[in-house]
Structures are given as C-alpha cells and as structure tokens.
Regions:
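ASCE P-loop NTPase helicase motor core
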Residues: 300, 321-324, 368-485, 515-521, ...
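Cys/His-rich zinc-coordinating "finger" modules and their low-complexity flanking regions
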Residues: 1-175
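Hydrophobic beta-strand signal
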Residues: 66-67, 285, 760
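Short, charged beta-turn/beta-strand-edge "cap" motif at the junction between a beta-strand
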Residues: 51, 71-74, 289-294, 542-543, ...
Length: 957
C-alpha cells in the first residue's frame, strides 16, 4: 500500500486547492446553496453543515462533528473547535475508509491529536501512531524497524493530514454554510452554557457585548470612572470564568508531613503542556469525594515545585485542617478565584470620583487629560545627590532625578540595563529626606517590589515590606524587611510573644486568645508602619486595610508600564501630592486577559497615555548590561539611537567560550533553521523540533566551555516550545541532566527586567501560509534582544520572519554584518539568503483606531488571550520607521472586497491557535496563534500533507 507523503515533499494538489479557495473568496459571489428539503445529517459539521463522511471528524468530548475544511478561518473547522473548546480527542466516521477509529498513541494510549504523529513502516502498508514525547523519544530503542527521526505530526498547517481525513473540495465548500471566524467565536462561547446553541442564536443581538473605549481626554471624573469600571467588570468576569474552567476531577495525591507541616503532592500533566500555570503562593482548594473518610475540603497554598518532574507540585495544608492522610484517590482540585484586585481597583475609582482630596488637583487634572501647566515644587538645592550604599550616578540619571524632585508628576523611562532601580532608590532617598514624610513605593509585581526594597535598605532608610496575608508563608530575599516578620519578632516573655509561641505549639488558639492575639498583632503592625519612612508593596496591596490609617503624599510606581491604569490608581488615591511613574513603554505592557477589553483600551498603561498626552519622560541613556554590539540595533530601532554604552567591548568578551561567533569581536548571530512549526500538545501554542535541537546543541557547547548553567537563558514566545525544549535537553543532551535542569527556559514576559550572560532566542514560527503571530510585537522583540550581557543567539527561519517589516530590518542588520549564518554548528557559514526590498508600509489609521487594531493583531489571540498592544510613541526618524512597520498591520477593510474584508476582520479578531506567556501572568490562560501578512511557500519549507491521490491508510498500529 502506498504510504502517506513524507514531511518535506511538495504537495502541488494542496497548493492548487488553497489557490482555488482563495480565488473563491475573492469572488464576492461566494455561492451558497442551501436545500431546505434535505434534513441536516447528524454528522454534519457543526460550523458549516458539510456532511461528507470522508471529510468530517467527531469531537469525542462534546459529540459534535466538524469538517477538515478551512472555510473562512485559518485553521480547519475541526482544529478550530479543538483549540477553542480545549478538547483533546477525535473519532473518524464509521463509514470512512478507516471506520470509527479513535487515533491514539501505540505506546501510551494518549488520544491528544496535537501530540500525535505517525511513523511510516519500512516494509508494511501500515503506520504507527506515537505521541511526540516521550514515546517517540524512546522509539529507536525498540527493534521494530521504525525510524523515530521520520516522525511527523497528524496536524500540520492547522489541518489534519488529508490521508487521515480528507479536505473538502472547492465545490463542497461552495455549498457549505458560510461562517465567519467571529461567528465561530460567539458560537463556541454559547456552547459553554447551551450545547444546543446554533448560528441563529449567534445572530441574536443580545449576545453582542459592547464595551466603552478608553479615552485620552475625559470630560468629567464620572466619565473616567464609568468607562474604567465597565472594562474592569468585563475583565473580572472573564478571569473568573477562566479559573472555574480549570477544575480538575478525580486526581491522585500523595502526602508528606515534616516539621509540623502537611504537604500534599499533586500531579498535573497540564503544567507541562502550559494549560495550567501555577506560581508560589497561589491558592487552591482540595476536596475529598471518596468514601474512605468524611467529606473533607481545605484551602491549600502552592509551596514548591518538584525538581524531578515538571508535572508535580507540592501544596501546604493550613494548620487545623486535618487532612485524610490515608486517602490518595478521589480528590477534586479547584482553582480559587479571588476578586481582591478588581474590587480594589473599583474602590480606587470610586474614591477618585467622590473625593477631590485623595490626590493633588494637578495630578487629578493630568489623569483626566486636561491641558494644565504643571507647577514646579520648591526644593532645597542639594550639594550632592550621592546616596550611601548606592553607586555614583551618570549624567542622565542625575538629570532625571533633579527634574523629578521639583515636579508634582513625572515619568522616568528606563531602557534595558540603564540602572532604573538604582535611580529610583536614589530618588526615593532624596524625596524622603527633602519632604520629611513617608513614601509609598509600588510595582505591579512582587519581584520588582523586592528588588527596590533591597536597594532602599542599603541607603539606611527605614524600609518596610508589606505583602498580602497569603504570601506571608513565602520566603524572599527581603523577608527580614517584611511587616509580618518584624511584627512577630518580639520578646518571648511579652504577651504577644507568649501567644505566638502558644499558637505555634498547639497549631492554633482558642477564641479568647485568638481575639487577644489579633488585637496585639494589629497594634504592633501599626507601630511598625507608623515608624517606617518607606513602605514597599504591590499596587494592589497598597489598598490593604492595614494602610487605611495613613496618607502617602509621595508615591513612586516602578514598572508602571506593566500595570493597567486602574491598577496604578490604587496607590495614587492614598493622598498623593507628588507622583513618579518609572517604566519603559518600549518594553512589555499590561496583561489583559479579555481581548475585547484589551481592544477597548485597558491594555494602554497610564504611563503610555501620559506620554501620548505630551508629558515628556526623562530617559536614562547609559546602558551597563550589553556588549556594545548587542545594544546597537535596540538603540537605533527603539530608542532613537540615544543609548550610550557604559561598558566596553573588552569587558563583555570571553575568549574561552567555544561558540563559533561569525565575527569574534561581535558575540551575536542569527542562526538560520528551516524546521516546520507544529501545534503544541495543549492545542493553544506552538513548538519547533528543529529549533529545539539547535538550542540543545548551543546550550551544551556553552556548558562544555565552562559557562555556569545559571548564566544561560533560553527565551521563547511560546509555552509549547518552552516545554519541548526542557524535555528535549533532558532526553538528548550529552551533559548530566542536572546541568540542563538549571538552565532557565522561559517566555519574554518572565525575562523582562532580568539578565543572563548568554541568551538563546528560539523564534519557533516557520510555516507555509501563516504569519509570525505576536513575534511581530516590537516590544516583545526589544525585551528578548536586551537580556544578554556577553552573547546573543537568535534561532529562526529568516525566509518567514523577513515578511514582517520589523524582523526584515533586524535580519538585514545581521546580514550586513555577516552575522546571519546557517549549517552545522561545527561548520557555520554565511547564509545565502537574499532579501528584497522591505515590505511596503500601508496608510495608517488614526492613532486611537491603530491602537485598537494593534491590540488584536499585535498579540496572539484565540479564546483566552493575554494582550499586550504595541506602543505608538514619540516622533523622530526611528519612531516614524516603526510606525510605518505597524501600518502594514492596519489595512482599511473598506478598501477591500467583502471576502477580503471578512478575512481581514477574522485576522484581527480571531488569530487562530497560539499563546501563552508565563510566569508573570496574573491569571491562568493559554493563547492561540495569529495570522498577518501571508507567507508564500518556500522550497525548503513545504507542506507535509499527503496528496489527495494517496490511498487511505487502512491500518494503524
């Protein structure tokens, strides 16, 4: 029997089919024939109604049928449904050539179609289905005549291989019911509550949710508050629904007791795939549903992650919740949703509306976008701005501090490696000394707050770190500064000390002692807070009731560009008279889970809005992190060429590191890889096996050269690639496994604000007909390129990436310097790829309209999409070039045919199958990919689809 086409073979039949379908959509006739006389078949596609048994598959999770045709989406209908619904098992039609087969792994039985692939037999007319990992990793060890290197996924280019389930013909698709990507999105949302919902329900206007858009200028405080409250409410509902959908049932646990603590170990395979993300301190609920003990439930807190398995996590059970230690099965796990941050944002908005004294009038006017003259604040001339415990400042840092000291509202822009934290600490020191009042220092993340608190402690200021009650059990580098630790550090023979000892000994207190304990502890905490000069906490925790008794005339918000505007408002309404926002609007912005809310403008930070209103940020201009050659492109592209180097080339070169840099004095290169991207096991992300293999080889070379594992970082935009790279290094790396475990593989988001000696970036995206997704986000690229100190290697497919204007200029930069290479790592040679003229920018929309479009296109989005929109910044040659780049993503649908317009709207609203980010997301979510300028097939990047003439496979192993 003829075998299916192998990966790498060109498939002209598929190309012709796609061409015909494209031509069909460009033709506005787009015929659709609906025969009301014929009843709809039970196995008809739930989207388009196509009912050819050879072209449909059944989703076994919901018992709905879907076809393998694209229609007006960038994925086939069955793949689109699996991604949106997070379903992971399919079945062929009983009348299809393969019968009612459920594809599953021959070795482990996994039925996840995003994980499955096939190996062709050498002598038999059969194929073996194996999951990508771990089963295919071990396939070569079986003496069965199978070659694991020939493994290919069942889904490529977002459609099932045509030898498994046929792709409908052009004629069939013409007769199918037309359905847009937006209709599919709404239909999937309706199915969550009503599995019988139809397209007729989708067309009901009641299901359309209209959200107000944020403005730059507000007429009144009431208008400002109402708009933001509606957006917060929509985001809150979306976030809550995400958490509720994560409930895990019938899980197995293991118990561990030591040092008076009870830990429960839970195995969650979804941790590895990225479908579930947990962080230290996250709250969950564990429920026992079996019959071996009374019904039991308890809140639990994530305490640590396994160093051996990426799927196991240990959670701590609170004292007093006696766990059923003899039970290991029949448990449910719920993800506790807390709306604390949302309620605090709403309270801050209400306070802004009701109390004009909650902040200085000039700050209030600036927030409303009113045109005001910002008055100067009288300051005593300081002979020296030096601060004990901190390094001397450079000219741009000194200039920024001098300007900020005399202004009621200021912005400081800190590009990568420019000493933003040191500058902030110096500024805080002088503000506290000059104003002789306490100061509130905030950031959206605990990591940023800890870093700033540590620097401030060195200056001799009385610093107190306030954390939420749920994080008090977690250790950090500044735990000794925390309020809860200092409050507990009392004389043992004091009344509070006695109660603390009694509580620890007995695991709790009686009601009378508990009341005394709380009163004494609150008094102790008040004394500490009142004595502090600087209180450091997150933006959300600045509304902690323990701070209600205090006013904070001085407020500094670090990483302000990563916080939403209502989040920044929480500390500002605590009586702010002088406000400093520190951040970088050319790096990552706020995380917004609901893409509709993002499009409405909530993903634009307060810092960015003030820049657009004309508030000029004070920019730090000397970078101390990167080798000068590494900083050249980011400086020219993102900072108007203004970044200066505070380190020399000699200080950032290591001659003993055996990486074959194309130019030894320039430790950087773009390593051309042509491997195809694949959808990850979660169905919502991407991976690239060829690039993962290159990552392992490069990491191994660095380790062998003596580079410490902790000084190597691997950055990838995709959670699927992150997990695959980690596993690939463990299975295939030639060094000891512990060395690879210490290598940090993470997202761009996780690396923001951090650095490593050597950074490897794996781009992942490599396809025939799709775009590069949120790789086109300029801020994401900026962060990825600016994490390395001594060396940077970017791995990707230049033929695909160069279709994007931003990446085109990046690749030309490397090509012109002979830094774009290909071949084996031991024999690198300059790449022969030739670039044509840059992609032609198209006419831009208005700034506000562009912002909304970028919110949709600049980030990947499927169903649960954390959105970071690209920034439209200040004027200048470099900025104008960047705006031109973004213009390619903002076609005006009115100038297109209806079919093209539908396609474009689908691109903006639906990006079909991708995403994530990681550590740092404040909510569980995965994301699904994006599609921009179409990439034409290259000879080296061809489809793995079987030809339509290939006989159907009749046997699986």
């Amino acid at each position: 029997m003829t075998q299916p086409a192998r990966t790498g073979e060109h498939d002209p039949v598929m190309d012709d089919l796609e061409k015909e379908i494209d031509e069909m959509y460009v033709n506005e006739a787009n015929e659709y024939v609906e025969d009301d006389a014929e009843p709809v078949a039970e196995h008809a596609c739930a989207y388009c109604g196509l009912d050819d048994v050879d072209c449909v598959m059944k989703c076994t999770a919901c018992d709905k049928w879907f076809c393998n045709g694209f229609g007006k989406t960038t994925s086939s209908h069955i793949v689109t449904h699996l991604v949106r619904a997070r379903h992971k098992s399919v079945m062929l039609h009983p009348s299809s050539p393969l019968g009612d087969t459920v594809p599953e792994c021959y070795s482990c039985g996994s039925r996840n179609p995003f994980l499955l692939g096939f190996l062709p037999a050498k002598g038999d007319a059969v194929v073996m289905l194996l999951c990508r990992s771990p089963c295919n990793f071990a396939a070569n060890t079986k003496d069965m005549g199978w070659d694991a290197t020939q493994w290919s996924p069942l889904i490529e280019n977002r459609t099932f291989l045509s030898w498994l389930v046929k792709i409908p013909s052009v004629k069939q698709q013409k007769k199918a019911r037309p359905i847009t990507a937006q209709q599919i999105l709404l239909l999937e949302e309706l199915w969550r509550d009503n599995e019988r919902a139809t397209l007729a329900d989708v067309e009901n206007p009641e299901h359309e949710q209209t959200l107000p858009e944020t403005l730059h200028h507000y007429e009144t405080a009431k208008q400002y508050v109402l708009i933001h409250q509606k957006l917060i409410s929509a985001e809150e509902d979306y976030d809550k629904r995400l958490k509720e959908n994560l409930t895990q049932r019938d899980i197995t646990v293991n118990w561990e007791t030591s040092n008076g603590k009870t830990l429960v170990w839970i195995r969650l395979p979804q941790l590895e795939s990225g479908e579930i993300r947990l962080a230290m301190g996250d709250e969950l609920k564990l429920i026992y549903t079996g019959s071996l003990a009374h019904k039991w439930e308890s809140p639990i807190t994530v305490a640590r992650f396994s160093s051996v398995s990426s799927t196991e996590v240990a959670c701590e059970v609170p004292h007093g919740h006696k766990a059923p230690l003899h039970c290991t099965t029949n448990f449910n796990l719920e993800f506790i949703w807390t709306g604390t941050t949302y309620s605090r944002m709403n309270r801050a908005l209400n306070r802004f509306f009701k109390s004009k004294s909650c902040m200085a009038p000039v700050i209030r006017d600036v927030l409303l976008g009113k045109s005001v003259d910002i008055p100067l604040i009288n300051t005593q001339k300081t002979l020296s701005l030096s601060v004990p415990g901190l390094p001397e400042l450079n000219h741009s840092q000194l200039s920024a501090i001098k300007a900020v000291l005399g202004s009621p509202i200021s912005l400081i822009q800190g590009p990568p490696g420019t000493g933003k934290t040191v500058t902030s600490a110096t500024l805080i020191y002088h503000l506290v000394r000059l104003r002789k009042t306490r100061m509130l220092v905030c950031a959206p993340s605990n990591v940023a707050v800890d870093q700033l608190a540590e620097k401030l402690h060195r200056t001799g200021l009385r610093v107190l770190r306030l954390v939420s009650r749920t994080r008090e059990v977690m250790e950090s580098s500044v735990s000794f500064l925390s309020l809860h630790e200092q409050a507990s550090s009392v004389e043992p023979n004091s009344q509070l000390g006695h109660l603390i000892q009694l509580k620890h000994k007995n695991g709790g207190l009686n009601s009378s002692d508990e009341a005394k304990y709380r009163t004494l502890l609150e008094n102790r905490e008040y004394e500490l807070l009142n004595a502090a000069e600087v209180i450091c906490t997150t933006c959300s925790s600045s509304a902690d009731k323990r701070l209600n008794a205090f006013k904070f005339p001085l407020v500094l918000i670090d990483e302000a560009t990563q916080a939403t505007e209502p989040e920044c408002l929480i500390p500002i309404v605590q009586g702010c008279q002088q406000l400093v926002l520190v951040g970088d609007h050319q790096q990552l912005g706020p995380v917004v889970m609901n893409r509709k809310v993002a499009r409405a403008g909530l993903n634009e930070s307060l810092f960015e809005r003030l820049v657009l209103l004309g508030v000029k940020p004070r920019r730090l201009e000397v970078q101390y992190r990167m080798h000068p050659s590494l900083s050249e492109f980011p400086s020219n592209m993102f900072y108007d060429g203004m970044l200066q180097n505070g380190v020399s080339s000699h200080e950032r070169l290591r001659k003993h590191v055996a990486i074959p840099w194309p130019i030894p004095t320039m430790p950087m290169m773009f390593y051309q890889n042509l491997g195809q991207e694949e959808i990850s096991p979660s169905g919502t992300s991407y991976l690239n096996r060829t690039e993962a293999s290159s990552v392992e080889k490069l990491v191994t070379a660095l380790l062998k050269a003596g580079v410490a594992p902790e000084q190597i970082g691997v950055i990838t935009p995709y959670e699927g690639q992150r997990n695959f790279v980690i596993n690939h290094m463990q299975f295939h790396g030639s060094m000891v496994k512990d060395a690879y475990r210490a290598i940090e593989v993470a997202s761009v988001d996780a690396f923001q604000g951090r650095e490593k000696d050597y950074i490897i970036v794996t781009c992942v995206r490599s396809n025939n007909r799709l775009g590069i997704g949120f790789l086109s986000d300029s801020r994401r690229l900026n962060v990825a390129l600016t994490r390395a100190r001594f060396g940077l290697i970017v791995i990707g497919n230049a033929r695909v990436l160069c279709k994007d204007p931003l990446w085109y200029h990046f690749l030309v930069h490397f090509k012109d310097r002979n830094l774009l290479v290909e071949g084996a790592l031991s024999n690198l040679r300059p790449s022969m790829i030739q670039f044509g003229p840059p992609p032609v920018p198209r006419k831009s929309k208005s700034r506000l309209e562009q912002a909304k479009t970028n919110a949709a296109i600049g980030t990947e989005s499927l169903a649960m999409d954390p959105v970071r929109a690209p920034f439209r910044g200040a004027t200048g040659t470099t900025q104008t070039l960047r705006e031109g780049m973004w213009d390619t993503l903002s076609l005006d649908a009115k100038t297109l045919s209806q079919s093209q317009s539908d396609w474009l709207n689908q691109v903006r609203q639906d990006k079909d199958a991708d995403l994530e980010s990681l550590d740092g997301y404040r909510s569980q979510a995965s994301i699904a990919g994006s599609y921009e300028d179409e990439v034409q097939p290259e000879k080296n990047v061809s489809s793995a689809q079987g030809t339509s003439s290939a006989p159907s496979i009749t046997k699986f192993l």
